[in-house]
């Protein structure tokens, strides 16, 4: 017999249960109904393993002040970092472009709304509160975003991004950003244009 516990584990994050924390608690409950020697325990930790391995780098491409609100438009999207639309917060760090005109006069801002490139209301990625003023050319680097971001990344408005791997402290490009050519590959229409 077997018991499949599925996924949804938090392993790999500080302050959260780690994989070894789950199994003694699970085993204690299962022993009431199953014989350990005759029962296979299956776990599917996928996203919690893959997320730790990936980051997603976005750049601020536009800044808009509307009334008392500041909106930052990025070249990434919530669809890239949270395709299941369930996260309420994101782990990230900033890489500020100090070559920006006015960068030396950055101030702390009470509120900045970080948005993706799409026109959809759900593409508001997060509210950046009481933080340094972000400007065009700054980067927002999202951490722990590997689970499902590659397989569920839509081709909505933008194509798949460049993908890099870090090996021995160096970055290597392993996939080029898609262009219309890759999007149209295997299309009958595209094939006719090539004749």
Where are these regions (language model features)?
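Short intrinsically disordered, low-complexity coil segments enriched in acidic
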Residues: 1-5, 39, 166
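Alpha-helix N-cap and loop-to-helix initiation/capping positions
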Residues: 14-22
